[in-house]
């Protein structure tokens, strides 16, 4: 069956794993104290300018346990702990997206998407009318859109790949990435329930690949420089690629 739908992981698949751990996470932790110091604690949810980034941050923080948001210090310590332990918390992910937005818009952050990935994202949707690319990441959908709207293509001017993408999924809209039910939910949402084999999911994390395969879709392991090595015995039964240019779809 011909593959006409590709779902892409981000970190370690289409951009270096170091981008998240060495650029995005540290930027968030560095900016967090300044951001929290501009907010009144206990939280005031009656901010008139509901379109402001600060209002969005306050609304997001209000979803944390009340015992956490008694002060800027306690809020910082709680969030820093989530980051340090790589906890896939939806409130943290939403807050990260809001703070990263400032970095992207100021030009401090640009997304180092691999050239082969840029090429694939630009060309695959143009092959046939039904060829589509979706993104599935633990990061919030807003953070995903920011990443793809500020891609470093080597010209010094950020490029926007969002027009080539048909949709986005995160842990709030699909579920956790190591659970087969999450991929089943995506299959339903993109109207591929009776055509799962026309869908391909790409990830550097073998547990995600296994979960995707269990749902009925195809899935390949992507190996990139700097990724955590996967034992050969775990890779033995999987299709492996080292670049999206290897895809013959």
UniProtKB/Swiss-Prot annotation:
Its cofactor is Mg(2+). One of its GO terms (cellular component) is nucleus. Pfam families: Hydrolase. Binds 1 Mg(2+) ion per subunit. SUPFAM superfamilies: HAD-like. GO terms for molecular function: acireductone synthase activity; magnesium ion binding. It is an enzyme of class 3 (hydrolase). Mg(2+) binds at residues 9, 11, 204. It catalyses: 5-methylsulfanyl-2,3-dioxopentyl phosphate + H2O = 1,2-dihydroxy-5-(methylsulfanyl)pent-1-en-3-one + phosphate. Gene3D superfamilies: 1.10.720.60, HAD superfamily/HAD-like. Pathway: Amino-acid biosynthesis; L-methionine biosynthesis via salvage pathway; L-methionine from S-methyl-5-thio-alpha-D-ribose 1-phosphate: step 3/6; Amino-acid biosynthesis; L-methionine biosynthesis via salvage pathway; L-methionine from S-methyl-5-thio-alpha-D-ribose 1-phosphate: step 4/6. Keywords: Amino-acid biosynthesis, Cytoplasm, Hydrolase, Magnesium, Metal-binding, Methionine biosynthesis, Nucleus. Substrate binds at residues 137-138, 177. Monomer. NCBIfam families: enolase-ppase. Bifunctional enzyme that catalyzes the enolization of 2,3-diketo-5-methylthiopentyl-1-phosphate (DK-MTP-1-P) into the intermediate 2-hydroxy-3-keto-5-methylthiopentenyl-1-phosphate (HK-MTPenyl-1-P), which is then dephosphorylated to form the acireductone 1,2-dihydroxy-3-keto-5-methylthiopentene (DHK-MTPene). This is Enolase-phosphatase E1. It comes from Lodderomyces elongisporus (strain ATCC 11503 / CBS 2605 / JCM 1781 / NBRC 1676 / NRRL YB-4239) (Yeast).
């Amino acid at each position: 069956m011909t593959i006409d739908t590709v779902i892409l992981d981000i970190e370690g698949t289409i951009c270096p794993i170091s981008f998240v751990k060495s650029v995005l996470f540290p930027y968030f932790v560095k900016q967090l104290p300044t951001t929290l110091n501009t907010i009144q604690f206990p939280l005031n949810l009656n901010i008139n300018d509901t379109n402001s980034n600060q209002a969005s941050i306050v609304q997001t923080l209000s979803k944390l346990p009340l015992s956490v948001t008694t002060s800027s210090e306690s809020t910082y310590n709680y969030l820093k702990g989530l980051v340090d332990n790589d906890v896939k918390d939806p409130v943290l992910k939403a807050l990260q997206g809001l703070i990263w937005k400032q970095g992207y818009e100021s030009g401090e952050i640009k997304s180092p998407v691999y050239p082969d990935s840029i090429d694939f994202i630009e060309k695959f949707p143009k092959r046939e009318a039904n060829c589509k690319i979706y993104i599935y990441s633990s990061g919030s959908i807003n953070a995903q859109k920011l990443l793809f709207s500020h891609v470093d293509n080597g010209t010094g001017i950020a490029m926007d790949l969002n027009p080539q993408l048909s949709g986005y999924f995160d842990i709030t809209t699909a579920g956790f990435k190591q659970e087969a039910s999450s991929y089943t939910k995506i299959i339903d949402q993109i109207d591929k329930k009776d055509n799962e084999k026309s869908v391909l999911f790409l990830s550097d994390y073998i547990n995600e690949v296994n979960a995707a395969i269990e749902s009925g879709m195809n899935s390949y392991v992507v190996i990139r420089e700097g990724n955590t090595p996967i034992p050969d015995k775990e890779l033995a039964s999987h299709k492996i690629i080292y670049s999206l240019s290897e895809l013959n779809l």
